[in-house]
Every structure is written in C-alpha cells, then in structure tokens.
Swiss-Prot record:
Pfam families: FMN_red (PF03358). It catalyses: a quinone + NADH + H(+) = a quinol + NAD(+); a quinone + NADPH + H(+) = a quinol + NADP(+). GO terms for cellular component: cytosol. GO terms for molecular function: FMN binding; NADH:ubiquinone reductase (non-electrogenic) activity; NADPH dehydrogenase (quinone) activity. The keyword NADP applies. The keyword Aminoacyl-tRNA synthetase does not apply. Its cofactor is FMN. This is Probable NADPH:quinone oxidoreductase 1. It comes from Oryza sativa subsp. japonica. Belongs to the SsuE family. Its EC number is 1.6.5.2. Keywords: Flavoprotein, FMN, NAD, NADP, Oxidoreductase. The enzyme apparently serves as a quinone reductase in connection with conjugation reactions of hydroquinones involved in detoxification pathways.
C-alpha cells in the first residue's frame, strides 16, 4: 500500500493592522499561529510586521522602480506567502492606517497581492471590527485578493466575559475554535486555487 502523498505546507502571512503591543487583533493572529501548530497539519502562520514601513510616498521610490529597504523586505514576504490572514481593527468605521499603508506599498509596481487567497479576523467594540472587514474586502477587489466568504469572525472584545488578557492574548476557547474554522476554510480554499494553476 502506497503512503499517502504529503500535503504541501501552506504559508500564511499574518498581518495585523494595529501596531499596539497588546492589540486584540494581534492576539487573534497569535492564537491562529498556535491553533495551526496544535491541530492543523500543513498550515503555517508567520507574523509579518508592518510597523517599520514608511508612510506611502512615491518620492521614496527609485527611478528604476525600486523601493526603500523596509518596503522591499515586506514585498518579498508578501510574494513568498501562499495566502494571508489579516487582523483588521476598525478605526472610524474603516481600515486602520497601518494596514492600508501596507496594502498600498505591496500593490505599487507589480501587485504582490494578486490572485492569492485571504481571510480576515477582527476584534473591537461595536460590531467587533466588522465594518473594517467589508472595507478591506472592497480594497481587495482592486488588488485581486480572493477572500473566503465564510466563516466570518468579528469579536466584540469589550463584552463580558473577557475574551483577552491584559497582554492582548486570546483566552476564550470558543473564539479559538472559531479561528480554527476560519483557518480550515482558508486552507481548503488555498489548496483549491492552487490546483487550478
């Protein structure tokens, strides 16, 4: 009997739109990395830091189409990823500035996001960041990102019982299970799109 073919390892670039150290959205992404290590073979979540990116300014681009070193390094990580998991906080009903800045830098010149799958998780007040998710999906249309539709995860972070500890780490087991379902959907969708290539 032949051994089953090994599943390819799918590299998930996890990008948090909040730069705050104890960000709840960062906590969701850390939990996602832990869930993958514990229970989802073939899926690896790598955090991609966007805090060092300069604000988008095309004057920083070189005459031959080059970018500042921090931007080049970020674009390389985006290109190397098989798919993306965005932790998208909601600021004033929309996407946080650091995340929009990262999206814009990696779309300059050759669009590094194009034709790759993605998922969004968010945490916050009100709708749990849900409105930022819809704006991110709208931006993704132009970037040719392919978002999973379901399941959605928007955590109402300030409702009781507490969902996060004082360091922003997820402590809610039910939300952790919901993150797992998002990741399984992203994994299946990524494999499906890769088979079409």
């Amino acid at each position: 009997m032949e051994a089953a073919a090994a599943r390819p390892v799918i590299r998930v670039a996890a990008i948090c739109g909040s730069l705050r150290k104890a960000s709840y959205n960062g906590g969701l992404l850390r939990a996602a990395a832990g869930v993958c290590e514990e229970s989802i073979p073939g899926l690896r979540v790598d955090h991609v830091d966007i805090s060092g990116l300069p604000l988008l300014n095309t004057d920083l681009e070189t005459a031959d189409g080059g970018f500042p070193p921090a931007v080049e390094a970020f674009r390389d990580k985006v290109r190397q990823a098989d798919c993306f998991l965005f932790g998208s906080p909601e600021y004033n009903y929309s996407i946080a500035t650091p995340l929009k800045n990262a999206l814009d830098w990696a779309s300059r010149g050759q669009n590094c996001w194009a034709d790759k799958p993605a998922a969004i998780v968010s945490a916050g007040g009100g709708f749990g960041g849900g409105r930022s998710q819809y704006h991110l999906r709208q931006v993704g249309v132009f970037l040719d990102l392919h978002f999973i539709n379901k399941p959605e995860l928007a955590v109402k972070a300030f409702e009781q019982p507490p969902k996060f500890d004082s360091d922003g780490n997820l402590i809610d087991a039910q939300i952790r299970e919901r993150i797992k379902q998002v990741l399984l959907s992203l994994q299946a969708f990524t494999l499906r799109l890769q088979k079409k290539d």
